[in-house]
Curated annotation (Swiss-Prot):
Family: Belongs to the thiamine-monophosphate kinase family.
Residues holding Mg(2+) 1: 38-39, 115
Name of the protein in its database record: Thiamine-monophosphate kinase
Matches recorded under PANTHER family: THIAMINE-MONOPHOSPHATE KINASE
InterPro entries: PurM-like_C_dom (IPR010918), PurM-like_C_sf (IPR036676), PurM-like_N (IPR016188), PurM-like_N_sf (IPR036921), ThiL-like (IPR006283)
Residues that, per the record, bind Mg(2+) 2: 39, 67
Binding site for substrate: 46, 251, 306
Organism: Nitrosopumilus maritimus (strain SCM1)
Pathway it works in: Cofactor biosynthesis; thiamine diphosphate biosynthesis; thiamine diphosphate from thiamine phosphate: step 1/1
Key words of the record: ATP-binding, Kinase, Magnesium, Metal-binding, Nucleotide-binding, Thiamine biosynthesis, Transferase
Binding site for Mg(2+) 5: 206
EC number of the protein: 2.7.4.16
GO molecular function, one term: magnesium ion binding
């Protein structure tokens, strides 16, 4: 690297993240079973225009934290690997390191170490670890279960259309949509507190339609969706494109969960106390696939979420 070499970048991250010494390996202690998740953020596909590098660093942590939230587990430790172009400036490295530090502080994560590389574009890889006796599965839903989602959905898709394609909207809505892209909020506290009531759950970052279809498939049940989890202002912005933003947009970092109806009152109470927005979107029944009920019609909801290499 011409302006900064690897050791200088490592020192910046160590200073920001509180790591004093480098080692060949890292040691940490967890009780119960180890829960792990890794995710990669690539500049060309995952960092939209106007997203700051610190926000991108936080997003790469959030991508993992969101999966922990869906499983009802709090992440405790992490490993971060970074790839920077050789001409990266010190200020950009500082900005990224600060973004990681703030994210780890926000979610209570201790960074153990990582790896540093040089390449054509910025790449962040994050691996997080936690512990739990068990996790909430994707395949546990039963007939007559209620389907809920933390939410609402569609703002991120709207924000991306504003940032990428310069779509216009009301000033207040545009600000809200862009914030959904640059500062997503995984629902960790809600997931941890309520996991005992979930029969199944799954993160929705690849798109709500993907999540619903995967959960229905793994549970060998039919998911009937009779309530779209969006707010009125999204409909005003999206018009005919509303369903695409809500069900296929992706990158919301919310999660879907199913519960026995007897736990509905408790779930709603806990959501209110934690200030977590949740929406009842449907129910589980016998059969297969996902059905969207609208205007007294059953419309198949296909998986059209985000997939790499498609």
């Amino acid at each position: 690297m011409s302006k900064l070499d690897e050791s200088e970048i490592i020192k910046i991250f160590q200073r920001k993240l509180g790591n004093k010494n480098s080692e060949d390996v890292e040691i940490f202690k967890l009780k119960q079973n180890i829960i792990a998740k890794t995710d990669t953020l690539v500049q060309s596909t995952d960092i939209p225009p106007k997203m700051k590098l610190g926000e991108a660093a936080r997003k790469s942590v959030v991508a993992c934290v969101s999966d922990f939230a869906a499983k009802g587990v709090k992440p405790q430790y992490g490993i971060i690997s970074i790839n920077f172009p050789s001409n990266i400036s010190r200020s950009k490295v500082e900005e990224a390191a600060t973004g990681f530090r703030k994210a780890c502080s926000e979610f209570g994560i201790s960074i153990l170490g990582g790896d540093t590389n040089a390449g054509k574009e910025i790449v962040f890889n994050v691996c997080l670890f936690g512990s739990a006796e068990k996790i909430v599965p994707r395949n546990g839903s039963e007939s007559k279960d209620l389907i809920f989602a933390t939410g609402p959905f569609g703002y991120t898709g709207a924000g991306l259309s504003i940032l990428l394609y310069k779509k216009k909207g009301k000033r207040e809505f545009v600000a809200k949509a862009i914030k959904a892209v640059t500062h997503p909020k995984p629902r960790v506290d809600f997931g941890v507190k309520n996991k005992r009531y979930f029969t199944s759950s799954m993160d929705s970052s690849d798109g709500l339609s993907t999540t619903l279809n995967e959960m229905a498939k793994q549970s060998k049940k039919k998911f009937v969706i009779n309530n779209s989890p969006h707010k009125k202002d999204l409909g005003e912005f999206a018009k005919s494109n509303q369903d695409n933003l809500v069900f296929h947009g992706g990158e919301e970092y919310e999660f879907v969960f199913t519960i026995n109806p007897k736990h509905k009152k408790t779930i709603l109470k806990n959501a209110k106390s934690l200030r977590t927005p949740i929406i009842e979107i449907g129910y589980v029944t016998t059969g297969k696939g996902v059905i969207l009920q609208r205007d007294n019609k059953d419309i198949p909801l296909k998986d059209k979420g985000w997939k790499h290499f498609r």
